């Protein structure tokens, strides 16, 4: 179940403040994110797909939705990524994504299966968006954020890019991510 937790990013000390909102209501999640320029949707699921599905199977199953998003957003490159709990680079990848960063393009993800925690640092707030199966999220270019896939990741996601290079991050150097709960904590 998708969920949204909102914190005030300005707090005394190193501990995260108490959340000002915590909800699993998809309509509230979408409305709160929309107020901050973040798009959130839920697409129909394809029950035949799971974390073990190949990139080709995933892209074929969602070809109509992918074409719509590409046409609307001008996305040149689309791929599907799957990461399981036995992936040899899971710890290294997790650490890379846990550092606050921005992108020069929108970060658009659709969770085919599994889950991941997007943490968005917008002004004086940190929004933690737990995305799960059938959640689609679009984070605008320049938004400070980090992502946690957990210690034992298990997800498949479709990624949309406006450039041929794929995922390119500009790290902020801000250690704020260390003050907030991780996926599974």
UniProtKB/Swiss-Prot annotation:
Ni(2+) binds at residues 101, 103, 107, 145. GO terms for molecular function: acireductone dioxygenase (Ni2+-requiring) activity; acireductone dioxygenase [iron(II)-requiring] activity; iron ion binding; nickel cation binding. Its cofactor is Fe(2+); Ni(2+). InterPro entries: ARD, ARD_bac, RmlC-like_jellyroll, RmlC_Cupin_sf. Keywords: Amino-acid biosynthesis, Dioxygenase, Iron, Metal-binding, Methionine biosynthesis, Nickel, Oxidoreductase. Belongs to the acireductone dioxygenase (ARD) family. PANTHER family: ACIREDUCTONE DIOXYGENASE. This is Acireductone dioxygenase. It comes from Synechococcus sp. (strain RCC307). The lineage of its organism: Bacteria, Bacillati, Cyanobacteriota, Cyanophyceae, Synechococcales. The gene is mtnD.
């Amino acid at each position: 179940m998708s969920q949204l937790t909102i914190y005030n990013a300005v707090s005394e000390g190193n501990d995260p403040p108490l959340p000002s909102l915590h909800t699993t209501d998809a309509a509230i999640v979408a409305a709160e994110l929309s107020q901050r320029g973040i798009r959130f949707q839920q697409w129909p699921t394809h029950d035949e797909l799971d974390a073990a599905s190949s990139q080709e199977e995933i892209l074929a199953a969602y070809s109509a939705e992918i074409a719509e998003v590409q046409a609307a957003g001008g996305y040149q490159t689309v791929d599907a990524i799957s990461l399981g709990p036995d992936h040899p680079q899971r710890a290294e990848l997790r650490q890379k994504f846990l550092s606050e960063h921005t992108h020069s393009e929108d970060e658009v993800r659709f969770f085919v299966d599994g889950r991941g925690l997007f943490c968005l640092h917008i002004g004086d707030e940190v929004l933690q968006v737990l995305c799960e199966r059938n959640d689609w999220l679009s984070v605008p270019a320049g938004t400070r954020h980090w992502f946690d896939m957990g210690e034992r990741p298990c997800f498949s996601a479709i990624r949309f890019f406006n450039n041929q290079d794929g995922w390119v991050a500009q790290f902020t150097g801000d250690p704020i991510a260390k003050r907030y709960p991780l996926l599974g904590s």
